[in-house]
Design a protein with these regions (language model features):
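Carbohydrate-active catalytic/glycan-binding domains of CAZyme proteins
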Residues: 37-295
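Secretory targeting and sorting signals
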Residues: 1-36
């Protein structure tokens, strides 16, 4: 009897010790947050002066709340002007699509460059807008779905005012040197620029600037990338443009917007693409409209 009782007591003591050790071990386990684990690069230009219209690459090791300069590439493309770069990593290489003229100069195409190291860039494609009487071709943004690489560019014609529309261009090869298009994103209304798309589940989400009201708008569709778009409302206050998104390690999305009136890139986060935190200023000296990608 005493032997069974002593055995039971020892069992309870051992169990208590094991539980205590497990609790202590659990308290010491470090689970990295997205902000600590997500290393990002941000491609941007610095302003309207001729010296600022070139490709700059910044790097973040805290999930994109602050950046430091990785490379002033001095890359300006064939026209000597590079603005609004969109960066993506694809098949082991980096690609940047960009606007080729200032916002006051006519542009009928966008260009694409590539790099293996983020420092040295080579232009590989010039993609015509394909729209009659093109006046401006702005802010080409990469969109990849199912291994297919697409670019969404904002195009306006000379024969109308306030008529920017988003058009989709599709890569014909894995080198991204040949492209088809344009295809219009039907339903997404007149005079929208800087359209950035992300698909979550069966829903495509577009974040775009209404160039008339100066608000960032959220649009969705469940039909296709090029049809059925419905306006779901505005984000933030007016005075921001160039929305772009990146997915963090914890599953959240981070949006960047360019506060073009007073300067600076601002950011917010969301777990569902519908509800967003308040904007906060990104530590990224000199940064303007650009995009981020996981390094």
């Amino acid at each position: 009897m005493r032997q069974r009782k002593a055995t039971a007591v020892r069992g309870r003591v051992v169990a208590a010790i094991v539980a205590a050790v497990a609790l202590l071990a659990g308290s010491l386990v470090w689970t990295p947050s997205a902000s600590a684990a997500t290393a990002l690069v941000y491609a941007t230009f610095k302003g309207d002066a001729a010296a600022d219209e070139e490709l700059w690459i910044y790097q973040s090791t805290n999930g994109g709340t602050s950046y430091s300069v990785l490379a002033d590439t001095n890359f300006r493309g064939p026209t000597g002007v590079l603005r609004d770069p969109s960066i993506v990593k694809y098949n082991g290489r980096y690609y940047a699509a960009y606007t080729v003229q200032s916002w006051t100069t006519n542009s009928t195409y966008f260009s694409i460059a590539t790099s293996t190291n983020l420092y040295n860039w080579t232009n590989i494609a010039t993609v015509p807008s394909g729209i009659a009487n093109t006046r401006f071709t702005w802010a080409p943004e990469f969109y990849i779905e199912g291994g297919v690489v697409r670019i969404i560019a904002s195009v306006a014609a000379t024969n109308c005012s306030n008529c920017f529309r988003p058009y989709v261009y599709t890569a014909r090869n894995t080198a991204l040197t040949s492209w088809s298009g344009p295809e219009q994103m039907w339903g997404l209304g007149f005079n929208h620029i800087d359209t950035f798309v992300w698909k979550a589940g069966s829903t495509w989400h577009a974040f775009t600037k209404n160039e008339t009201t100066k608000y960032i708008e959220h649009w969705t569709t469940t039909a296709s990338l090029t049809s059925g778009w419905v306006n779901r409302g505005t984000l933030f206050s007016s005075g921001y443009e160039g929305p772009s998104l990146v997915r963090l390690d914890n599953g959240q999305w981070r949006i960047y917007v360019d506060k073009y009136v007073n300067g600076g890139v601002w950011t917010a986060t969301s777990s569902d693409l519908w509800n967003w935190s308040s904007l906060s200023l990104v530590g990224c000296s000199g940064c303007r409209h650009g995009t981020a990608t996981v390094k």
